[in-house]
Amino acid sequence: MRAVFGGQHGEREMQSEIAVKLSENVPRYTSYPTAPHFHSGVDAAIYRGWLEALESGDEISLYLHIPYCDKLCWFCACHTKQTHQYEPVAAYLRSLNAEIVTIAGLVSGKAHVRAIHFGGGSPTMLRPNDMVALGAALRDSFDLLPDATVSIEIGTNDMDKARLDALAQIGVTRASLGVQDFDPQVQKAINREQSFLQTKAVVDGVRSRGVESVNLDLLYGLPNQTRETICSTVAQALTLEPDRMALFGYAHVPWFKKHQTMIDEAWLPSPTERFAQSQLAARAIVAKGYEAIGLDHFAKPDDALAIAARAGVLHRNFQGYTEDRCPTLIGLGPSSIGRFRQGYVQNMASTAGYGRMVADGGLAAVRGVALSDDDRVRGWIIERLMCDFAFSAVDLVERFGKAGEKLLHRSRSIALHDPARALEFDGDSFVVRAESRPFVRTIAAKFDTYFKGGTARHSVAV
C-alpha cells in the first residue's frame, strides 16, 4: 500500500481499473499453507514431538487466546463467544493454566520466551486478579528473556482503573486497541459503541502506566461507512499519536461467522468504494509522517516495525505484520495456531473439547500441516511479497538450491504472462508494481499450489 499515495487523477483511474481486475476472493496469507488446508494428520503426538525437538537456546513466542467477549461485535471474524456470566471464563482459565504447565514442562530449560501476545476475543474482560495471576503463571512456568515484549488486545469498553493497573503488573509493553470507526451510525451497524473520549482515556491510561507502544486498528468497508466517516476517524485517531496503526478491510464472511448475518449487505460499500476508502485513509496516515508497512500497517519511523521493514526483516503471522523473528510460535488456548520449523499446528476450536484434551497433561492439537520443501520455498516467496512487495532471485536460489531454481522459472513465467503486468522482473528481483501493491494478496495467490479459485471462500483482496 505504501506506494499508492499519489494524488493524480489518472493514477486513481488506473488503480480503480486494477481493482476491478484483481479484487478476487483470496487468502490473507498469514501462513503458508493457509489454515483451510490444515488436516488431522498433524495431531497431539506430532505436536509433542515438535515441542520436544526444540533445542537449547531456542527463542520462542507465545500466543494466548481468550475466546470470550461480554458483547459480540457483528463485524468480528475471530474465534470467540459472548458470555454474560464469568464462570465459563474462570473454568476456561483453569484449562489454560493446565496447558501452560504441560507445554512448559516440555520446553523449559531449552527455550527462552522472546514475546508474549494476549489475543481474543477480549483478553481484557478477565478480572484484574485473574489477569495478574495469568501473567505470573507464564513468568513462573517459562524462561522469559529480560527484554521480552508483552502485547495485549484491549477491549476499550472493558477497561477501568483496576484493569489498567493489572496491565502494568503483568508487564505489558504494547497495547492494541480496536477503533474500527468512530462514527455513531457505523458503530450502531456493527454493534460496537465506543467513543473517541473512551478510547483516548484508555490510551492515556496505558501510557501513564509505562506501556511503550500503542497500536490502533481501523477498518474500512464497514456498513454505513463512507469516505467522510473513515477520513474523520483517521483524523481523530491521529490526534492520539499512536506508534502504529493498522488499516484492515472488513471481511464479510457470513458463511463462516454466522453473526455477520446481522449486517445488512445493502449497507456495505461497493468494491470501488472500499478501495477509495482504503486509499484515502492510507494517504492521510502517511501524510502525518507514518511509514506504510506491507499491505495494511503503518508505523512511526522510529518504531521497531518500521525499522524491521526498512531492513528487509519484516515477518507476517496470524496477528499481521511483526518484527518478531522467532521461528517458533506456541499457541495456547482453543483454536490457537502454533508455528514450528517443521510446520503448523492448531488446537481444538471447541472450548469444551479443548478443556477435556488438556486435562491430565494432554495436548489439544487436532490439525495442522507438516511443511514440504516446496511449501518452504513458496512460503518464503509469499511472505516476502506480502512484506516487501519483492523478492530477490539470488536469495531464492541461495536459500533453497534446486527447489529455489524450480520456483525461479515459475516466477519468471508468472511475470511474463500476467495480463495485469502486476509483477515485473528487473533481472535481479521480482517486484510488484507500485499501483498493484494494494492487491498483493492476488499476486501471492499465483504461487499458492493449494488455492483453487472458486473452491474455497475467502475475503476480497482489497
Q: Where do the PLM segments sit?
A:
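Minor-groove-contacting beta-hairpin "wing" of winged helix-turn-helix DNA-binding domains
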Residues: 429-433
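A short, conserved structural fragment
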Residues: 418-428
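Flexible, acidic/Gly-rich N-terminal and inter-domain linker regions that tether
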Residues: 1-61
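Short amphipathic alpha-helical interaction segments
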Residues: 403-416
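C-terminal scaffold of the Radical SAM
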Residues: 52-59, 83-106, 112-402, 461
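Local cysteine-cluster metal-coordination motifs and their immediate loop/turn environment
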Residues: 64-80
